[in-house]
Amino acid sequence: MRDKLAPYLSEYVLCKGWIDNWEKLEDGKNRVLIKSPVIKEPNKNVMFDDLKLISKEHHINLFLEPKEVKGGLQRLEEIYFTGNINRYTRSDGTRDYGIHPTPYSSLHNEIDAVYEDLVNALNDDPRLFITHDNLMK
């Protein structure tokens, strides 16, 4: 059981793990098995690696709508996700804790990727000057 999650019931958390496997369920959702998830307390003023650790688990299952995996899944891909700690009953009647995923924005990562593409494309022409700061304005 994921007992370390119990004190955080209904709390919002930040997570990182690796996609291990997935399957489409009868109800249309996708069960995505995340291996070695790291679960941390959120703090917008601290980088993820430096956040307070709640727990490191063996695995967590995420149940996602088809639109949430429209970009496809790749085995062993690192994934960041957010959610709320929830308690559920397993089919054998035992209780455990999991994470109900919530929407997550990776806009900052997309901006960084655009910046890198621009720098690489414009780097050969010294008349074209672009910085990370003026790209973000």
What is each residue range found by the language model?
Residues 1, 136-137:
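Short intrinsically disordered terminal tails
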Residues 26, 43, 90-92:
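Intrinsically disordered, low-complexity acidic/polar segments
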Residues 15, 30, 56-58, 77-79:
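A generic structural signal for short beta-strands and their flanking turns/coil linkers
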Residues 35-37, 84-136:
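OB-fold/S1-family single-stranded nucleic acid-binding modules
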Residues 1-7:
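Transition segments tied to proteolytic processing and entry into folded domains
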Residues 17-20, 76-91:
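Flexible glycine-rich surface loops and low-complexity tracts that mediate binding to linear polymers
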Residues 7-41:
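Structural detector for short beta-strands of small beta-barrel domains
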Residues 39-73:
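Beta-strand/loop nucleic-acid-binding surfaces
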